[in-house]
Amino acid sequence: MGRPAFPVKSTAATAFGKTDSVFEHVIDPPEPLSTTWFRLEILAPVHNERDYEAWMSSIEHIHATAGFAPPDRGGDDWPTPRTLDQNLADLEHHRREFVAGEAFAYSVLDGDDVIGCVYIDPDGSGAADAMVRSWVRASRAERDRDLAVEIDQWLRDAWLLRSRRWPGRPALGS
């Protein structure tokens, strides 16, 4: 049983040379977004130490962020404390998903500092073109909504996603 199909048409024939994506149509992601206060980079092992520090210092804040409820509140088991090596394995997994066109994860940076992440996945509910979640570290909590709004606009304008489902953020995505 695979992930749900991603119902988006792309103008590109292949994404990263792959034609066997689990998405219904091949996605060729646009250039990562860059704004006056942050830039996106494809989440990769190069971010390991900075990513680890960002979310490990912000577990409670992330659990309070829309889309990241802990298991006792109906969410999944991330984030929970883990080792730097376990985080590296997770980043390698996200990178493989990106290259295969299965899901798209980005590190959010301000200069060289990792201040959050963005995850773009097929929408398992079928209610939207994509399911999107984002978080910022606790020390940047005031930017949480700003990040989500800018990402949503980028997904609409550059990715051409007509509808985006943001769990816990009903004002976004339509």
Where are these regions (language model features)?
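GNAT-family acyltransferases
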Residues: 2-140, 149-174
